[in-house]
Amino acid sequence: MEYTTINPATEEELYTYHQTTDNEIEQILDESQTSFRSWRNHSFNFRAEKLFKIASLLRKNKYALCNAMAIEMGKPIAQGLTEIEKCAVVCDYYAENSEKFLSDKHIRTERTSSYVSFQPIGPILAIMPWNFPFWQVFRFAAPNVMLGNSVILKHAPNVSKCSILIENLFKEADFPSNLFSNLLISSENVPAIVSKIIPDKRISGVTLTGSAIAGSFVASLAGKYLKKSVLELGGSDAYVILKDADLNLAVPQCVTSRMNNTGQTCIAAKRFIVDETIADEFIELYIDESKKYIPGDPLNEYVNMGPMARRDLQLNVHNQVLLSIKEGAKLELGGQIPERKGFFYPPTVLTNIKSDSLVFNEEIFGPVASIITFNNENEAIQLANSTDFGLGAAIFTQDIEKGNLIAKEKLEAGSCFVNEFVKSDPRLPFGGIKSSGFGRELSELGIREFANIKTVVVK
């Protein structure tokens, strides 16, 4: 079976791929398990040497890798360069720190020795999305290969070239054959094939970054077969703008968060909850800042906004905007599909949003900002927490003590930032709560998710 990828900026066909066959999947599962059994016995220094090499290769080949992202899913070159550097940083970070993170933790008891050891568990299936084709993979793969696990990647089919380039990086860095493997699977066949792979005894765990629907499917299947799973799902991140916020700081941060990657980011700001006394000024400044984002050719290094990754994504966002307007939202900016080739969508701003509306409660995966007003802080926090999502949140205020308290104790999310837009950092754990998933990636905590946290006692 074959499938073809499409350039979202030109609508031209790119590449045709042969789907990985059942026999090839069987071979990959066998070889992944064999590679794991050997790899786990190598020293941290041995593993780190190869991961450092990948970091070097990422930096060396950054323009070629960025070009692949630009033509496959529409990411502008400038944003692609940032993504590739972040991948190199996460490789360096785990190469430098994994031995420390995974060292035995001794606990004093009446025995001669009692300690916790962190051991690899085996091949891990990674089901990854298209929006950050390299970062989503490396933030998971880097810690897991340092832990000693092997990785089988099922990437989004519209970024198949990126997935092949990632696999080639592992080969060029002299990792063992099939320690990192890549499955090419068309969208319509993903549920059936994943349903066969997860129950397989050669798979020890599964991680997914994607929608809540996909996460529920994978988690239920993993749970049925008692496989460890980690899920990073969608978000409808709320940014709370208190009346004492510095709008010259807040607005650029808010717009950057919403517009990055054409709004196709799980941890993007999606709902702006603004004190009613400053709402008019915030809206005016937000619209002015949004107009700086002009859709264009992602291969042009000066373009700051590319197309959406697929036609169905463009149409879905547009339909959400139209329905929101029917529900009473006011269109302040954008909201029209441009008459041009490509799956472009303009910066769009909606106001007069009600808490029971679609745009408030659903994730909008595109460059659409929803602005909601409040008249007291308790109402703001209630609005921020009232959806099923809990990935990220931010608060803007000049009262740092208050901002810290609200971020720490009152906002329901896996990451809460004060006076800055939410972003992932290799040094900090990342993940969500509620319908935004469970488990953590990155940091010392992330590398332990797919470890056997083993208690060892010597009398």
Question: What residue ranges belong to the model's regions?
Answer:
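N-terminal Rossmann-like NAD(P)+-binding subdomain of aldehyde/semialdehyde dehydrogenases
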Residues: M1-T112
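Residues at or immediately preceding the N-termini of alpha-helices
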Residues: P8, D22-I25, F44, K62, ...
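Conserved C-terminal structural/oligomerization subdomain of aldehyde/semialdehyde dehydrogenase
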Residues: T10-T16, I203, V240, I294, ...
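ALDH superfamily catalytic-core signature
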Residues: L14, D174, I213-K354, Q382, ...
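Short, well-ordered beta-strand elements within core beta-sheets of diverse protein domains
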Residues: Y15-T20, S35-N41, A126, Y239-L242, ...
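Structural signal for hydrophobic packing residues in well-ordered secondary-structure cores
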Residues: F36, R40, A55-K62, C66, ...
